[in-house]
């Protein structure tokens, strides 16, 4: 079947409307979008059952038959007067049913649609203009099973849903061939009056509005709701669009909402129509009315003021008390899908917030741990909100909303709001030195792990049976309280660490701390939420005891599942703090040490003054012997000693410490430190050998990395094993210089690789390696 035969026997092409989008899988398949009108060339394709050969936009290909709907042929072309006569002869028809002349049959060569507009059509032929497909809708004549008469559908393009589309049953007619309305029905409104261009429809006043025309919905909304909403004869077209106003006039919102409901009744403006030509920040805000001197409307129409008649209002809404000012974050002002069809509200709040007042009342009535949990959560996430908003109502709303927003997985806006409130809570810096910070984080980590293990002790295969749960319910309840308390203490410390990390320039470390803290905080919120629900039911055995395998976890199971993952998250955060302890707590350590050493300052000052006098007396005694010994040495050795003495870096001259002055306080290096010293010296020797043999860059890059890694391990081990303050300061001084030499080695390696085979760059790398080797030997000799 290659087409349908007409009355004269000539084949006519069938038209079909696309029901779904089609993305081609091969070059022979035809791509089309939902609503496109295709011309069926052949329905019986050999060896391709269920596929039709179609034509779209001058391109021929195969299309799946189950995605197309054959349209009945439109009536033959005719002049405009008979068309209007048909409307007059059938007054019983609804105003939405029109007969449309069939479009001309496309030729073998695709003709640009612009040619239809450039040449004015003859005055005798009244054919409606078919606009360009990307910007306007297509007109389709279709027979349906439910309606025996012909109906007109305006099918929108999916890529143009944000633009003001043409209304249903309204067509754009060229100005030269526009026909007057029917004379027999003067009471009817003008049928075809739409701006011919997009610029005119956007900027100028609508001519249809001046004549009392209906303001159309977009075609997608018209198909869904099945009718057109109207506006009460606006005087200016700019009244349709929402415009931002100053915030000082926001106090009259309640009166404006009541007036808009009385004036408009059941009619409403689509929520998204006012967003076409208004700034994004004004979409979710309310605006006061602007009185006009003349005209039936005394106020501008704004987005939140017009009710939508199609959907009932929600059951739970906030009581808009004028004495309470709610602090709504800016991220909540973005309109969401679930709030597109609700009654007007001054504040665009998340979906979870309407349940907050009722939950607050229940928690207020309950006693014991429930109240504690509420206080903990509010102190955690809303301490800053409490200082900004003194009203107790706003504090409770924001605290409860922060808990609900963290748990909401269906709203990205609520999750963003929780993270933003997290960032706004700027934690203070921890006044701790490195040792105290490590001890604190280790103790808090152990406390959390032990509290979680006390709960896991009761979890077994039969722990939810009534007999087992009845015997252990009190202990399980106490274990959940300990988990909440220990995790809250750890979060206090973690917030302080984050505040300390905010002063660093290392963005990677800040990101690690922030992400890991967010993970722990999310787990804490889930534990709080589930524990509150368990407290609300009173830990009833009738609710918690079960002998069956549950398909979905209840509150107690969810608490256990989340608590099981907390120790691992705590361990990761503690590892980050311990590994980067010097960066985080270096400034605090430097500030505290002079205060702690103040009582011994006079003693040390006197000791530093007396030591040079003793050394001067010993030098006077030993001077003749040293001169005699120096005269006996060969001149080459004397010159070498002078060169070494002048070439030494002053920072590398570490004095013989208290290990020689006081033998009782001799430093005893552990086996690990000795191994690291030996490995570092050996790695430096291997690097020097590679540079002497002119090895390729790949070789000495690996060897340089090994030196840096071993050097870092050595410094960490020395700082951990040295606990006495006197020795610790000397070791920190030598370790700091060792780290600077390791950094210089890394920079020299990078420069040598980039400039390879430059002899100067390789020589500089060799010099840095020799400096590092010399300082390592001196450092080791000082400690032993």
Swiss-Prot record:
Gene Ontology CC annotation, any one: cytoplasm
Presence of the UniProt keyword Ribosomal protein in the record: no
Residues with the Phosphoserine modification: 197, 246, 302, 373, 387
Domain SH3: 11-73
Compartments, record wording: Cytoplasm, Cytoskeleton; Cell junction, Focal adhesion
CDD domains named among the record's database cross-references: SH3_CASS4
Coiled-coil regions, chain positions: 466-536
Keyword entries, A-Z: Cell adhesion, Cell junction, Coiled coil, Cytoplasm, Cytoskeleton, Phosphoprotein, SH3 domain
Gene Ontology biological process terms, A to Z: cell adhesion; cell migration; cell surface receptor protein tyrosine kinase signaling pathway; positive regulation of cell migration; positive regulation of protein tyrosine kinase activity; positive regulation of substrate adhesion-dependent cell spreading
Subunit-structure text: Interacts (via SH3 domain) with PTK2/FAK1 (via C-terminus).
Similarity field: Belongs to the CAS family.
Function per UniProt: Docking protein that plays a role in tyrosine kinase-based signaling related to cell adhesion and cell spreading. Regulates PTK2/FAK1 activity, focal adhesion integrity, and cell spreading.
Full protein name: Cas scaffolding protein family member 4
Organism expressing this protein natively: Sus scrofa (Pig)
């Amino acid at each position: 079947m290659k087409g349908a035969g007409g009355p004269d026997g000539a084949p006519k092409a069938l038209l079909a409307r696309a029901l779904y989008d089609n993305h081609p899988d091969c070059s022979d398949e035809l791509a089309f979008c939902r609503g496109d009108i295709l011309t069926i060339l052949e329905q019986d394709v050999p060896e391709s059952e269920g596929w039709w050969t179609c034509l779209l936009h001058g391109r021929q290909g195969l299309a799946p038959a189950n995605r197309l709907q054959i349209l009945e042929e439109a009536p033959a072309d005719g002049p405009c007067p008979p068309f209007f006569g048909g409307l007059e002869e059938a007054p019983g028809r609804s105003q939405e049913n029109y007969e449309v002349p069939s479009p001309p049959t496309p030729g073998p060569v695709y003709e640009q649609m612009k040619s239809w507009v450039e040449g004015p059509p003859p005055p005798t032929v009244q054919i409606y203009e078919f606009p360009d497909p990307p910007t306007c809708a297509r007109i389709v004549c279709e027979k349906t099973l439910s309606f025996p008469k012909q109906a007109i559908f305006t099918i929108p393009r999916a890529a143009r849903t944000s633009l003001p589309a043409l209304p249903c049953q309204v067509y754009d007619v060229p100005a030269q061939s526009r026909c007057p309305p029917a004379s027999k029905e003067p009471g009817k409104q003008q049928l075809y009056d739409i701006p011919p261009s997009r610029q005119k429809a956007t900027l100028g006043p609508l001519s249809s509005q001046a004549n009392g025309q209906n303001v159309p919905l977009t075609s997608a909304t018209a198909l869904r709701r099945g009718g057109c909403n109207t506006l009460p004869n606006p005087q200016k077209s700019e009244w349709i669009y929402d415009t931002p106003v100053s915030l000082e006039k926001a106090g009259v919102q309640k009166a404006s909402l009541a007036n808009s409901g009385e004036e408009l009744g059941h009619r409403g403006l689509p929520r998204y129509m006012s967003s076409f030509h208004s700034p994004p920040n004004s979409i979710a805000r309310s605006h006061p009315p602007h009185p006009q001197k003349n005209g039936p409307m005394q106020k501008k129409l704004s987005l939140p003021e017009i009710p939508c008649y199609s959907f009932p209002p929600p059951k739970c809404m906030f009581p808009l008390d004028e004495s309470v000012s709610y602090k709504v974050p800016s991220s909540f002002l973005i309109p969401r899908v679930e709030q597109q069809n609700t009654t007007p509200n001054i504040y665009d709040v998340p979906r979870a917030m309407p349940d907050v007042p009722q939950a607050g009342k229940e928690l207020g009535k309950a006693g014991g741990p429930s109240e504690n949990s509420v206080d903990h959560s509010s102190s955690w996430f809303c301490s800053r909100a409490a200082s900004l908003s003194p009203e107790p109502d706003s504090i409770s709303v924001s605290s409860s909303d922060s808990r609900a927003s963290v748990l909401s997985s269906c709203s990205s806006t609520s999750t963003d709001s929780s993270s933003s409130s997290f960032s706004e809570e700027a934690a203070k810096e921890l006044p701790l030195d490195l040792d105290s910070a490590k001890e604190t984080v280790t103790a808090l980590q152990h406390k959390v792990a032990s509290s979680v293990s006390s709960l896991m002790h009761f979890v077994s295969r039969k722990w939810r049976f009534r007999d087992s749960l009845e015997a252990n319910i009190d202990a399980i309840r106490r274990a959940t309280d300990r988990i909440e308390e220990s995790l809250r203490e750890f979060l206090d410390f973690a917030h302080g660490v984050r505040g300390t990390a905010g002063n660093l320039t290392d963005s990677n470390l800040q990101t690690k701390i922030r992400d890991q803290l967010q993970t722990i905080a999310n787990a804490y919120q889930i534990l709080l939420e589930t524990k509150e629900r368990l407290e609300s039911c009173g830990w009833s055995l009738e609710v918690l005891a079960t002998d069956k395998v549950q398909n979905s976890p209840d509150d107690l199971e969810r608490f256990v599942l989340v608590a099981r993952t907390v120790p691992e998250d705590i361990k990761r955060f503690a590892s980050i703090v311990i590994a980067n302890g010097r960066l985080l707590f270096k400034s605090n350590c430097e500030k505290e040490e002079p205060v702690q050493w103040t009582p011994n300052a006079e003693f040390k000052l006197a000791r530093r003054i007396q030591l040079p006098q003793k050394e001067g007396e010993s030098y006077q005694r030993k001077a003749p012997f040293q001169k005699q010994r120096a005269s006996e040495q060969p001149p080459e050795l004397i010159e070498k000693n002078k060169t070494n003495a002048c070439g030494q870096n002053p920072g590398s001259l570490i004095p013989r410490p208290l290990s020689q002055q006081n033998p009782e306080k001799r430093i005893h290096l552990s086996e690990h430190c000795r191994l690291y010293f030996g490995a570092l010296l050996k790695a430096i020797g291997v690097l020097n050998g590679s540079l002497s043999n002119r090895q390729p860059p790949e070789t000495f890059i690996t060897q340089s990395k090994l030196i840096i890694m071993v050097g870092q391990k050595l410094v960490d081990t020395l700082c951990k094993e040295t606990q006495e303050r006197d020795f610790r300061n000397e070791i920190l001084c030598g370790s700091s210089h060792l780290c600077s030499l390791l950094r210089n080695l890394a920079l020299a390696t990078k420069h040598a690789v980039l400039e390879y085979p430059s002899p100067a760059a390789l020589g500089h790398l060799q010099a840095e390696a020799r400096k590092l080797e010399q300082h390592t030997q001196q450092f080791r000799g000082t400690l032993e």
